[in-house]
Amino acid sequence: MLKTMVDSGNLNTVCEEARCPNIGECWDNKTATFMILGDTCTRACTYCAVKTGKPTSLDLEEPLRLAKTVETLGLNYAVITSVNRDDLPDGGAFIFAQCVTQIRKRLPTCKVEVLTPDFEGNWNSLNSILLAGPDTFNHNIETVRRIFPVVRAKGDYDLSLKVLKKAKELSTNKSLITKSGMMVGLGETQNEIRETMIDLKKVNCDLLTIGQYLRPTTKHTPIAKWYTPNEFSDLEKMGLDLGFKHVAAGPLVRSSYHADEQHRTAANYSV
């Protein structure tokens, strides 16, 4: 049913576009991740399956269609993410904010998480989304500092950290939960992973997801290492020991993996 509704509403889900391996599990739990602002990204990160090129024109009706779909499906948790839209002055922040606002109007019980780009450091864009009142703000660091410029040539490691820091500072919701995610298997070391975790904790990041990098095609960055389940367990323990409220680590873990569960854990967290 969810796929039918998404298709009929002319919506994109990152579950499909990014070929997420957990699509069935999340949809069964009334959690879905919607990819707004089209299906074409203005950047060309060498790990990502989403197509790149010149995006389509802005669809101002998208927030209402998305909210109607969320309401009809009775979702418990909706994640809103997007392609990068560096062609737009605000990076698409207005549409992000409208999506949150429309969901709030139609299904107030649904928790909303936003997984945003860096908006090239435009804090007005970031603030406009925070004013709409998401429950969780997510921005992925993706990889360790050394490898970052190799796979995210148009991004910046320190800017990504600053986005997470600014989200906490700008939000009027002092209980805002922040979250980030990273891939492993790109050639990083254990020490580099730990350093990235420490960097994220320095900007008060609450939640962390860690998954195995899976090469979308032979044109993308090769896999340097396959992590074992035990190694993922060690990474989860490392993150929890460093103070994250919840760490989801595993071969098939992605940013939105059990997002509703992560949010509940953080919301009920006590030291």
Per-segment meaning from a language model:
Residues I36-L37, V114, A249:
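Small/polar loops that bind or transfer phosphate-bearing groups
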Residues E25-E62:
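Canonical Radical SAM [4Fe-4S] cluster-binding loop centered on the CxxxCxxC motif
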Residues P21, T42, R145:
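Nucleotide phosphate-binding site architecture
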Residues A49-R65, T72-W123, I129-K165, K179, ...:
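Core AdoMet radical
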Residues A44, L88, I147, T218, ...:
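Glycine/Thr-rich phosphate-binding loops of Rossmann-like dinucleotide-binding domains
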Residues M1-T33, L64, K68, Q98-T109, ...:
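Auxiliary Fe-S-binding modules of radical SAM enzymes
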